Amino acid sequence: MATSISRRQFLKASGLAAASACAAGLLSSCGGSSSAGSTGGSASGSVDTTKYTILYSSQPATLNYLTTATDLEMVVGANCVDTLVEYDNKGVMREGLATSWDWDADTLTWTFHLREENWVDNNGEVVAPVTAQDFVDALKYVLTPDYASSNVGLVTAYVAGAEDYYNYYVYLNNANTGVVDDDGTTYTADASGVVTVTSSDGTAETYSPVDFDTVGIKAVDDHTLTYTLTYDFPGFLSLLCYLPYEPAYGPLL
């Protein structure tokens, strides 16, 4: 089947909030990006360059681009929400929502400077500006075990503090729900939130509560975003083209 979706329309996403009834906003096309055109023309031969037409074999099960790892669903998010950087049709990296970026090898930190863009509703009306905090909110969503993001490993392996934050809440959820692993590992939590993980041989480790402020992503101001890495990973810029690093409109999460 074929469907036409506007680059500036709002995706009604059933899974983006815990109630599975929240909506994901679309970003307007970046100034440095090529606009996507319709694959079809009118009788006069003109092409509607405000529409992007895509063919797909079945309906997406979700439009939650922060959690899905299904090709069909990832295509929707990739075509509708801008990333910090992107590749052109020759495979050359160029500006996306970021106008420039810098690497500090001493602190293992990338700094991105954002252009002014907006979230829009299903009528193309501006809802709010896109800010660095939208990237922070989206990454926190990805790292929250309750939302079961299939792409969380693309974050925990590279962003400083992300693995500790994610693992703590996995362990806490296990303790709260009485999970016992196949190997006999058990989880308990005290009133202060300290989790004890006890293996079948009696060996125990404790994990104190972890605040999201310890994760290596910061909104310095509305248009400045930083990522601090666990190590100097040369492919991090490419990684930013993947869905878990896309922004999301915070009030809708």
Model segments located where?
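Short, well-ordered beta-strand elements
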Residues: 48-58, 109-112, 225-226
